[in-house]
Amino acid sequence: MPLEKSLLEADIGALVKSTLSVESDSVNIYQEIAFESLVKDTIRLANGLQLSKVNEQYVCGDILLSDKQVELLAKKNVSRGISISELSQIWQDKVVYFVFASNVSLKDQNIIYDAMYEWESACNILFRVGQGSGDYIEIIIGNGSYSNLGRIGGKQTLSLFIAGWNKGTVMHELGHALGMLHEHQHPMRDNYIIVNERNIQIPARDQFDIWPYGYASSKFDFDSIMMYGSYAYSRNNQPTMTKKDGTTWTANRSYITFNDQLVVMNLYGHYLPPGPIG
């Protein structure tokens, strides 16, 4: 299909050249996608879920998936479903260990600490510098903003895109590291929104598939820190998603909602008061 190929090449170029999704002139919402400048192979599982693969790494938008997670997803069908606790392991004792790569400046570290404190203040999670018992996150400035889903065991990566990120980006990616999925891929989303596939950049279409499993909340939350905005990954400045009445919304990257709190508490248990990070 020559037309489809040319559109794909154009969309890859758009993703590489543009680090800002089209949201609002007053709010910086940066692209959240893994391996921004690399061409990915597309993989469609038998249950319809589309993933990408770069070298040996499975990717769904800005989520990195382990071989074990993909194997589990491939075995599950829509009717049976899958729980979030099956799909992503939680962090032991509610403590997330992390280290900074050498390319993360002190200024950047302070922004990241602020984002961590937002989660600590809202939920029952503690962030601590170090490698713990061997399961930890290395935070890097890299080729895209992305994270593994939950704790995968050993060292894992949380990347912030070298071309642009902010505190809200960190809050979003930390949500994935804790085990949260995208709100706009919630199995109930079609009751609340319309996805305009023709307006989505082709390389980003896997970010708009419904995940019929892995959600810890039955409520759909437009303000979730894990929700994309109406113009995310638009190829033509038209909305990729609208509410049922045709209106649009801007992604929240400023605060953690009550529903976000409930999701994390469903995963990790009761609330713990925040302590000093470090």
Regions found by a protein language model. Give the residues of each.
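Zinc-dependent metalloendopeptidases
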Residues: 1-278
